[in-house]
């Protein structure tokens, strides 16, 4: 059975980022998470992580499209 929630440390490992970077994503609101238990362990719902990854793909595609457009404009000016 696939878990519904994963610890923030697992999120960091899955995204190949540090634990502090994963926590920064939560603090900024980019990645939704909840605190569970007496020690306040952060957990991220797997569907939230998947949504974050999808949004990151879309943002990257937008950045790349802007870069391509800038290159086309530069090439037009250089002619």
Protein language model features and the residues they cover:
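Major-groove DNA-recognition helix of helix-turn-helix-type DNA-binding domains
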Residues: 15-42
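Basic Lys/Arg-rich amphipathic helical interaction modules
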Residues: 1-24, 46-79
């Amino acid at each position: 059975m696939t878990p519904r929630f994963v610890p923030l440390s697992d999120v960091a490992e899955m995204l190949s980022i540090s634990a502090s970077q994963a926590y920064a994503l939560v603090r900024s609101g980019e990645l939704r998470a909840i605190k569970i238990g007496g020690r306040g362990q952060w957990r991220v719902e797997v569907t939230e992580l998947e949504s974050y990854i999808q949004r990151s793909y879309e943002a990257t595609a937008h950045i790349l499209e802007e870069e391509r457009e800038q290159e086309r404009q530069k090439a037009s000016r250089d002619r």
